[in-house]
Swiss-Prot record:
InterPro entries: Glyco_trans_19. GO terms for biological process: lipid A biosynthetic process. GO terms for cellular component: membrane. It comes from Helicobacter acinonychis (strain Sheeba). GO terms for molecular function: lipid-A-disaccharide synthase activity; phospholipid binding. Belongs to the LpxB family. PANTHER family: LIPID-A-DISACCHARIDE SYNTHASE, LIPID-A-DISACCHARIDE SYNTHASE, MITOCHONDRIAL-RELATED. This is Lipid-A-disaccharide synthase.
Amino acid sequence: MPTILVSALETSSNVHLEELRRNLPKDYRFIGVFEGSGALYSPREFSVMGFRDVIGRLGFLFKVYKEMIQLAKQADMVLLMDSSSFNIPLAKKIKKQDSHKKIMYYILPQVWAWKKWRAKTLEKYCDFLGAILPFEVSYYQKKAQYVGHPLLDEIKYYKKDIKGETLVFMPGSRKSEIAKIFPLFVEVARILEQNEGFKRRVLVVPSFFKGLDLKALYGEGIEWFEISYDAHKSLFEAEFAFICSGTATLEAALIGTPFVLAYRAKTMDFLIARMFVNLHYIGLANIFYNALNDETPGLGESQLHPELIQHFLSVESLIRAYKDMDRERYFKESLKLREYLMHGSARKIASEIAFLLNLT
């Protein structure tokens, strides 16, 4: 039975991993960090935000790092997904420990945004680099291949027009995000019900919150919303969405749902991030839309959807974005973005895993 050491610390990575596993033979055994039986740790134990939060958990992260290095000895190959701050040092250590160990990196770090030197590091220590964006490959020498975007494996609903019956609210999956964004969304929902007559307001809740006390997690105002655990279906049925920054923004764009990105970080974290990452946009859909228009990703002039960040984010600005958005233009351009990303990646990655295992 082939054994694969997996390091998938992000919630979104585990959604992609689930689709990948459907395309692999049943007898493959997974060990490491992922969501599911047999995991050493769940990704929920890594949901920290901000520089100070990470510093406070360095002891735990170093413990996991050492355990993963030991686990690698049992594995036939290694699959690293996203989370470059953890996974790049892990790749280096595992390769130095066993130079013959095959390492695949799927969902590459955003070297086009910052720390471009990481591309050379990945080339040196990994055997296959699975790029999910067409323009990423140009930042690497020879080991990177464009494999398609995993969201196009997972999304089953695509709009044929911009009609919808609901307003969808997605305030993030981390408690720190929810605390900052959800109160604004509650007020927006109240105002739009009064002024626009919307009766159906849907709060999309991460599936791993099932069984938890949602009132304790979200606080006052949750009674204003219908609860949904199906983001894709909810976005498909929506007339408009209010979304905290993250993978959900790209999901909305691919489905074709008009939306506004809302994000507010701790002031110190935001200032530190700005020192290292100089981007006009933080939304994945806008970043990819720049590339689609032959502009530098994240630094172009073209914009698919509005972004309201830090002090620009308020109840008033959210409502203004809802009212002012050119929905017809957005929908037409979102179809171009869907075509740009073309196809999913699970089947391609599964075949590459089988190929690497045959080399061991």
